[in-house]
């Protein structure tokens, strides 16, 4: 695995142990494929998995990744765009255990997944995950509560960590799941400021005034 303690986290989830992690997705990694792989392992063992994301685009990404490794009947999506009737019908199917893997937007955090073993919330700093109606419930609060009460593993993931996720890490309630520093250096883009040396300024005196100096065009 590309993450420190990543393999032990996956093993714990698959074994049915309670593991909680703040996952900082490394540059270039396909987070949807990673979650799909773990959710499929959980479902294969007869348990349930729940993935909550901010918008339809992320739901589509997770659904596509899941359908590459599990049957379509194993995956249930719950989004506002489906309309009340279709959403309620899918809610009932989840309640009766007809779909072991549920993927959806904010309200999917309440999905009654049978034998829930693993839950994931991506990009928990996104405003779409906060209910605009009182009491303004955040999907993060729903899933952390469910993890505590139902004893399921939990991932809070994103490219950056929110203050709330950091507090959970510092309190010891969950641990961090990050790539080693050397790996991050290798994956991160090389950043070069235009006109950051006397040599560059001699070659292109107008670099300070130009929106795109000549060095940018040369790099492109």
Residue ranges: model-predicted function:
Residues 31-39, 63:
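Motif I (Walker A/P-loop) of helicase-class P-loop NTPases
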Residues 2-33, 153-220:
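Conserved interdomain linker/interface between the two RecA-like ATPase lobes of SF2 helicase motors
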Residues 79-84, 126-136, 200-208:
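Flexible beta-alpha connector loops of hexameric P-loop NTPases
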Residues 97-101, 106-155:
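SF2 helicase catalytic motif II
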Residues 19, 46-47, 71-74, 115-117, ...:
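Short glycine-/polar-rich loops that comprise or flank the Walker A/P-loop
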Residues 47-55, 76-80:
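Conserved RecA-like ASCE P-loop NTPase motor core of nucleic-acid helicases/translocases
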Residues 61-70, 74-116:
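Conserved motor-coupling elements within RecA-like helicase/translocase cores
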Residues 16-24, 46-49, 99-100:
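Pre-Walker A (Motif I) flank of P-loop NTPase domains
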């Amino acid at each position: 695995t590309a993450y420190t303690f990543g393999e032990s986290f996956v093993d714990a989830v698959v074994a049915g142990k309670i593991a909680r992690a703040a996952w900082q997705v490394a540059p270039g990694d396909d987070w949807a494929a990673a979650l799909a792989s773990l959710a499929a392992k959980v479902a294969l063992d007869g348990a349930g998995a729940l993935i909550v994301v901010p918008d339809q685009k992320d739901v589509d990404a997770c659904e596509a990744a899941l359908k590459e490794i599990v049957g379509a009947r194993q995956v249930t999506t719950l989004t506002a765009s489906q309309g009340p009737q279709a959403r309620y019908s899918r809610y009932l199917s989840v309640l009766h255990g007809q779909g072991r893997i549920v993927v959806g937007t904010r309200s999917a955090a309440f999905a009654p997944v049978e034998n829930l073993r693993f839950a994931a919330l991506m990009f928990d700093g996104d405003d779409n995950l906060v209910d605009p109606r009182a009491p303004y419930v955040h999907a993060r609060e729903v899933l952390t509560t469910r993890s505590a009460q139902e004893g399921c593993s939990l991932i809070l993931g994103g490219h950056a960590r929110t203050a709330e996720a950091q507090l959970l890490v510092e309190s010891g309630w969950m641990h961090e799941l990050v790539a080693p520093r050397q790996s991050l250096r290798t994956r991160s883009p090389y950043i070069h400021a235009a006109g950051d040396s006397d040599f560059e300024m001699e070659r292109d005196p107008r670099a300070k005034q130009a929106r795109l100096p000549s060095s940018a065009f040369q790099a492109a």
